From Swiss-Prot:
Residue span of region Disordered: 1-26, 255-400
Annotated localization: Nucleus
Gene this protein is translated from: YJU2B
GO CC terms of this entry: post-mRNA release spliceosomal complex; U2-type spliceosomal complex
Cysteine disulfide links: none
Organism: Bos taurus (Bovine)
Name of the protein this chain belongs to: Probable splicing factor YJU2B
Highest taxon of source: Eukaryota
Coiled coil spans: 182-214
Positions of post-translational Phosphoserine modification: 40, 310
Stored Pfam families: Saf4_Yju2
InterPro entries per record: Saf4/Yju2
Polar residues composition-biased segments: 283-292, 327-341
GO terms, biological process: mRNA splicing, via spliceosome; response to virus; RNA splicing
Protein function: May be involved in mRNA splicing.
């Protein structure tokens, strides 16, 4: 750097070559500039490249081979006439300093402190590499004929052992001799494989679009093909096919039943069962504790007369509570709800209106011939269950 800057540069007027000699001495500087700042201590700063992989002892990080550092170089000794240099550098990942020095005896570098070597060395003999002949052995081969003959026999036996391996290597090299043909064959195989992959992708896309699938399909295997060959699928009938099948069944069906008697008996039995069910429901609905009488329903019978009665006589009759009944009429006989409904239907409108106005307490009294000590429980007046009394008019009947 100093020479480059000093050559063809400015020379001051007071520069004397005999006195100063060079521009560096004139400027009182070193040609290496900052690299020679510790030159008085015998230390020169150089650019050092890591010879192998190591681990830093300070940060425990890996430092690869080929990483460069600004290292302080100094001489620490000699191996015979070969100087031994030591290099001190700072780790770029921490504040730890690493020291290494040369090993001329083994043509290697040795770590002094600050790091640990990643062991990747091997024995050349174990690795079947060519070993260098030592100087003493080389001189002995040149001077001693018997030693040279023995050494030759050992070399020939080693060659016989390595011959199969060497022949295999030669065959492999000859197979790759024509690189153009190999490249053409490789590209052709690649095109065929690419075309097959494109066809398979198109089939997968068509299947996904047909089945509305959004999942990726895995490649088909031989087991899948064998399993698919064993399966059998039945197609579902459409609506039109089902309708045709129904029409065919209806057309092929017989118009007449196979056993008319059996069908008639089955229909009659079903009707009988329905009637029995209705009767059972009616029995559950009607009370069966005591018979219903005329007194329970509040119906009063009047004897029919040829001459219509006056309204005053009718009112007196209702007030006295002793209606005149025709002979042979039993007032206290039980009356069914069906009889009541028929009698009410035959009653004229005027009689029904009068009966509705009558209260439930104006019930008929028992006949005089009956003793009051033992009244009939059916003739005793009971509360009206229909809410209003009914008066039956038998004016058009045939009773005397």
């Amino acid at each position: 750097m100093g020479e480059r800057k000093g050559v063809n540069k400015y020379y001051p007027p007071d520069f004397n070559p005999e006195k100063h000699g060079s521009l560096n001495r004139y400027h009182n500087s070193h040609p290496l500039r900052e690299r020679a700042r510790k030159l008085s201590q015998g230390i020169l700063i150089i650019r050092f490249e890591m010879p192998y992989n190591i681990w830093c002892d300070g940060c425990k990080n890996h430092i690869g081979m080929g990483v460069r550092y600004n290292a302080e170089k100094k001489k620490v000794g000699n191996y015979y006439t070969t100087p031994i240099y030591r290099f001190r550098m700072k780790c770029h990942l921490c504040v730890n300093y690493i020291e290494m020095q040369t090993d001329p005896a083994n043509c290697d570098y040795v770590i002094v402190s600050g790091a640990q070597r990643k062991e990747e060395r091997w024995d050349m003999e174990d690795n079947e590499q060519v070993l260098t002949t030592e100087h003493e052995k080389k001189q002995k081969l040149e001077m001693d004929a018997m030693f040279r003959l023995e050494h030759g026999e050992a070399d020939r036996s080693t060659l016989k052992k390595a011959l199969p391996t060497l022949s295999h290597i030669q065959e492999a090299q000859s197979a790759w001799k024509d690189d153009f043909a190999l490249n053409s064959m490789l590209r052709k195989r690649f095109r065929e494989k690419k075309k097959a992959m494109q066809e398979e992708e198109e089939r997968d896309q068509a299947l996904q679009a047909k089945a509305s699938l959004a999942i990726p399909l895995v490649p088909e295997t031989e087991d899948d093909r064998r399993l698919a060959a064993l399966l059998k699928f039945h197609t579902l009938d459409s609506y039109e096919d089902k309708q045709k099948l129904k029409r065919t069944e209806i057309i092929s069906r017989s118009w007449f039943p196979s056993t008319p008697g059996a069908s008639a008996s089955s229909s009659s039995s079903s009707k009988t069962n329905s009637v029995l069910k209705k009767l059972a429901q009616n029995r559950r609905a009607t009370p069966t504790s005591s018979p219903v009488t005329m007194g329970h329903l509040g119906i009063v019978r009047r004897r029919s007369r040829e001459v219509p009665e006056s309204p005053q006589h009718v009112a007196e009759t209702f007030k006295s509570g002793e209606p005149q009944l025709p002979e042979g009429t039993n007032q206290n006989r039980p009356v069914s709800p069906q009889d009541c409904s028929l009698e009410t239907a035959e009653t004229p409108k005027n009689s029904s209106a009068l009966g509705q106005e009558e209260s439930c307490q104006d019930r008929p009294q028992p006949p005089p011939d009956t003793s009051p000590e033992a009244p009939n429980p059916q003739d005793t007046p009971q509360p009206c269950s229909l809410g209003s009394s009914l008066v039956a008019d038998y004016s058009g009947s045939e009773s005397e």
